Amino acid sequence: MTAFTRFAHSRASWFILTGSAIALEAAALYFQYVMKLDPCVMCIYQRLAVFGILASGLIGMTAPKFLIVRILGAIGWAVSATWGLKLALALVDMQNNPSPFSTCSFLPEFPAWMPLHEWFPSVMLPTGMCTDVPWQFMGVTMAEWMVVAFSGYLVALLLFIVPILSGSNKPSLYK
């Protein structure tokens, strides 16, 4: 077993994934409440995708020696990062090519049985417009930085998918 595979089978690797998602969520809340930047609907959806990555990391951390746990974590990671990248690219397109015919809604379209914007309004209620670009760092907008972040998550998954799926590490209940 290689060191890379051992790392993929450790809690540390899943902890890093979880920690990076927590850092992104903390940054989002900092932008919203300290810098007073209003999140749009697409931002809220991306925030939910980051929560999906966070949850996937927590799943992987529970028992990373078991193949099924690593597979479930990797599936959640892949779905969340892909969905987040799709949303970030759509938001970049909206900001770069504003159109009165292509706008985002004022309220998120969560399922009726899971109205997150009503349950957690301080985190999931959008208050901004998608076409606004209120913040840039090094000439790159927040939406473009999220493209970088979600792309990074997908590249990391591609690097780790083979070690994650290798089942050579048999756990022992007596260690």
From Swiss-Prot:
Q: Which organism is it from?
A: Shewanella sp. (strain ANA-3)
> Any S-S bridges, and between which cysteines?
40-43, 104-130
Q: Name one GO biological process term.
A: protein folding
> What keywords are assigned to this protein?
Cell inner membrane, Cell membrane, Chaperone, Disulfide bond, Electron transport, Membrane, Oxidoreductase, Redox-active center, Transmembrane, Transmembrane helix, Transport
The task this protein performs is described as:
Required for disulfide bond formation in some periplasmic proteins. Acts by oxidizing the DsbA protein.
The family database entries (Pfam families) matched by this protein are listed as: DsbB
In the UniProt record, what gene is named as encoding this protein? dsbB
Q: Which family does it belong to?
A: Belongs to the DsbB family.
Where in the cell is the protein located? Cell inner membrane
- Name a GO CC annotation attached to this entry: plasma membrane
Q: Which residues lie on this side of the membrane: Periplasmic?
A: 31-48, 90-144
GO molecular-function terms, A-Z? electron transfer activity; protein-disulfide reductase activity
Membrane topology (Cytoplasmic): 1-13, 65-71, 164-175
The protein here is known as: Disulfide bond formation protein B
